[in-house]
Amino acid sequence: MLKVKSDFLTKDQVIYDVAIVGAGPAGIAAGIYGKRANLNLAIIEGSTPGGKVVKTNIVENYPGYKSITGPDLGLEMYNHLIDLEPTFFYANLIKLDKAADTFILYLDDKTVVFAKTVIYATGMLERKLGVAKEDHFYGKGISYCAICDGSLYKDQVVGVVGGGNSAIQEALYLASMAKTVHLIHRREGFRADETALNKLRNLPNVVFHLNYTVKELLGNNTLNGIVLQNTLDHSTKQIDLNCVFPYIGFESITKPVEHLNLKLDPQGFLITNEQMETSLKGLFAAGDCRSKHFRQIGTAINDGIIAVLTIRDVL
């Protein structure tokens, strides 16, 4: 009998072949391949299945779909998985332990899951601006999901911070409904897809603020403006607006495993071998939480498939 924390419930002592933490593209792909390989698996997800895909307006680089909304693609992935009838735990992982050859997963609904192996596919968290009152204005003028909250600001003035694909795609989406979109980027050059960037440049209601960062958030109960600072001459200017959408990068979600002393890269992402196994035997990482150069839907799916097929071969 495996011992667990006294305040957690153990409905049974089933030890799954693999527990998949996260139901984004990596976790869903691992689940589909795992079920088809006859593995007894559990999937743990406390948020909307689909990962960051469901927060994306339009996806135009996923094979088989010339253009599809992120929520629709995420739903199709999820339905494909659910049709295979995996065991699903709709909760968040708060801590992962290992006792001998068995992993113990503590969930925030006070249940516990046991597994021989784990695929950690938690994705990433949006990086915050790092300015005063950011948490205070969350939901009141600060949003990290344009497709979730953009319609609340129809015919209003909004800002998007960032210069990558996410920032440009969400600025395009917001420009279809907002009165004005202010695109704020800390440098001249962009890392975004040139086609999408050119579309944005040609829109009459988009204003570019290059070589600027957000220095201050203005307002009392709700956001009503921001102060920008020039990265070259440090001059400042104020913009009156109703909401800011930061898209300035992401951070790995490693708190549930931080006590395991896993190998991480300098940015805090999990280091794996080519089979997606971390420095702890039996613990695999897949998708955006893994240390790698490219983070795309396709690369996440690749990670999940490799991880679960490796597990199939070793169990």
UniProtKB/Swiss-Prot annotation:
Q: How is the cofactor bound?
A: Binds 1 FAD per subunit.
UniProt entry tagged with the keyword Flavoprotein: yes
Gene3D superfamilies, per database record: FAD/NAD(P)-binding domain
Superkingdom in the source lineage: Bacteria
Q: Name one GO cellular component term.
A: cytoplasm
Query: Which GO molecular function, any one, fits this protein according to its record?
Result: thioredoxin-disulfide reductase (NADPH) activity
Q: Which GO terms describe its biological process?
A: removal of superoxide radicals
InterPro entries assigned:
FAD/NAD-bd_sf, FAD/NAD-binding_dom, Ferredoxin-NADP_redctase_2, Pyr_nucl-diS_OxRdtase_2_AS, Thioredox_Rdtase
Other remarks in the entry: The active site is a redox-active disulfide bond.
- Return the PANTHER family for the record: THIOREDOXIN REDUCTASE 1-RELATED-RELATED
- In its UniProt entry, what is this protein called? Thioredoxin reductase
- Organism per entry: Mycoplasma pneumoniae (strain ATCC 29342 / M129 / Subtype 1)
